[in-house]
């Protein structure tokens, strides 16, 4: 099976769907919103071609479910807020938003939400239907998606840790895994494995920057949010817990060791410095803003997180119940690729053990994601200077 066929979230609206298990991502988007507003404010001051009539925006790696339109709402509200600050100096522009993800993404679940979304925009923002146009642009964001110099703003959240392929060199000429017992570039991985993953990320992220810089107008903006490495050695990434759960099944005799050793996630979690260096080395963008922040795995399920818990989501204090929620969130993201390699039957067992490990680390305060927000502006061509 081709990798792109399984690089997707769980679709639909069932109990294991991404739509029902993305409260954490909702919180991250809320934390990014002030930076998004500032980015839009700077964009509208830049006097890009045709921006006063039609702002062209893309959300790269949009996934599915309500969070997709939460991002769209935040972008629209930010544009309208800046317009109000200008006291109607400019007419309210049309906004054209392209939702991008791989071809297997559940775009239909998003499209079904659009009629009510448009009505809500009209009621809350005064945007008449037709003044915000939303469509899909399926394809890999590591390839060209839009014509040259046609876009004003590109946004991506929690996507860039996904690589275009599993790095080469993880199996010797004799067919022996060089990453035994691991499923990605973890702290326990050997240095050659860590280098192979970093090299693949560098290649992919450089391609991402180069291709999308060509699609943006000069001075166009890009806002990226991604998982990043922290400085704390004892912090556990969710993929570490997933790795531990799969190893448990091997030890218990439910899974062959060779099956584990032949599996490597096309995922790399970079450091903030690695991201910064690649941007500077590629050279198409100026870094306007860079910040890191932490969010606990169980964020979205506690009043202390300052998260607007939805009415049908009960707030629990028991760590085992929280751990089940964390396991469901991770399952919604990784189940398709895990099932393609290990089989669907063993998925419940993997995440049952994942939840057990999560319940142990949640009380320690070491179960969190480090996150990076980076705001970029495309440098002008020499002919534009």
UniProtKB/Swiss-Prot annotation:
Keyword annotations: Magnesium, Metal-binding, Methyltransferase, S-adenosyl-L-methionine, Transferase
Keyword Transcription: no
Tissue expression profile of the protein: Expressed at low levels in young leaves but not in mature leaves. Barely detectable in fruits (grains).
Cofactor annotation comment: Binds 1 Mg(2+) ion per subunit.
Feature type site, description Involved in substrate discrimination: 155, 267, 344
Cofactor: Mg(2+)
Residues the record lists as binding Mg(2+): 179, 261, 263-264
Family (UniProt): Belongs to the methyltransferase superfamily. Type-7 methyltransferase family.
Its job: Involved in the biosynthesis of caffeine. Specific for xanthosine and could not use xanthosine 5'-monophosphate (XMP) as substrate. Catalyzes the 7-N-methylation activity of xanthosine, but does not have 1-N- or 3-N-methylation activity.
Protein's recorded name: Xanthosine methyltransferase 2
Organism: Coffea arabica
UniProt gene name: XMT2
């Amino acid at each position: 099976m081709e990798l792109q066929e399984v690089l997707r979230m769980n679709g639909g609206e069932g109990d294991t769907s991404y739509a029902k298990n993305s409260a954490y991502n909702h919180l991250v988007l809320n934390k990014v919103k002030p930076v998004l507003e500032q980015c839009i404010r700077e964009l509208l001051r830049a006097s890009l071609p045709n921006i006063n009539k039609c702002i062209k925006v893309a959300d790269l790696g949009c996934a599915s479910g309500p969070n997709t339109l939460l991002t769209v709402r935040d972008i629209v509200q930010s544009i309208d807020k800046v317009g109000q600050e200008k006291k109607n100096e400019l007419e309210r522009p049309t906004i054209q938003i392209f939702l991008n993800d791989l071809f297997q993404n559940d775009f239909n679940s998003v499209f079904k939400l659009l009629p009510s979304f448009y009505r809500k925009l009209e009621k809350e923002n005064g945007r008449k239907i037709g003044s915000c146009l939303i469509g899909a642009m399926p394809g890999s964001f590591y390839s060209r998606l839009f014509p040259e110099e046609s876009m004003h703003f590109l946004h991506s959240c929690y996507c860039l840790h996904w690589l275009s392929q599993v790095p080469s060199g993880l199996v010797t000429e004799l067919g022996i895994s060089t990453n035994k017992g691991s499923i990605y570039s973890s702290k326990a991985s050997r240095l050659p494995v860590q280098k192979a993953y970093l090299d693949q990320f560098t290649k992919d992220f450089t391609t991402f920057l180069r291709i999308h810089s060509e699609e943006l107008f000069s001075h166009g903006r890009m806002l990226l949010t991604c998982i990043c490495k922290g400085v704390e050695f004892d912090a556990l990434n969710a993929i570490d817990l997933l790795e531990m759960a799969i190893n448990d099944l091997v030890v218990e005799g439910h899974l062959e060791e060779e099956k584990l050793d032949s599996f490597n996630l096309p995922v790399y979690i970079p450091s903030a410095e690695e991201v910064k260096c690649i941007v500077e080395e590629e050279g198409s963008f100026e870094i306007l803003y860079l910040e890191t922040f932490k969010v606990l795995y169980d964020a979205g399920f506690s009043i202390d997180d300052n998260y607007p818990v939805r009415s049908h989501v009960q707030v629990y204090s028991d760590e085992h119940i929280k751990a089940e929620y964390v396991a469901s969130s991770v399952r919604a993201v990784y189940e398709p690729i895990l099932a393609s390699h290990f089989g669907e039957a063993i998925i419940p067992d993997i995440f049952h053990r994942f939840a057990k490990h999560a319940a142990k680390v949640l009380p320690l305060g070491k179960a969190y994601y480090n996150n990076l927000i980076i705001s970029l502006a495309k440098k002008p061509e020499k002919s534009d200077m």
